[in-house]
Amino acid sequence: MSGTRYLQGYLPSNGAVGTRIRIAGSKGILTIKSAVKGISRAEFEYEIPLDDAKIMLHTLCSKPLISKIRYKIEHSGLTWEIDIFDGENAGLTMAEVELENEEQHVTLPDWIGKEVTGKMRYYNSRLVNYPFTKWTDEEKKGL
């Protein structure tokens, strides 16, 4: 199974709106996200020139950048995205599935660990300021 390398960063934010610059494989992507409401948020995503994405990542985004490999796995009719982080977030692996609505039933694969939905420290935008390698043992256990 092959994954896609992601390198992403976040522009400084006022907290209500987040702006992410990402390189996914060989594509540049600009994403604008609203604040979270429940388990959902408004999200707008646009492909941008790869060279522009590289410049924005290295000159405009907060550091450290988020580096990970994403794998996609099908389970019970849904596509799970599995992110294996490296760099400042080495050791962290997260799984996510996109739902059609908040009430949609999900059959969890037996390889899923602890539920972290809504736990802010797991947001990629938060991992920039407080990377996984700096977490305490208690935080890594999910307490």
Language-model segment annotations:
Residues 1-143:
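Phosphate-end processing signature that detects enzymes handling 5′-triphosphorylated RNA
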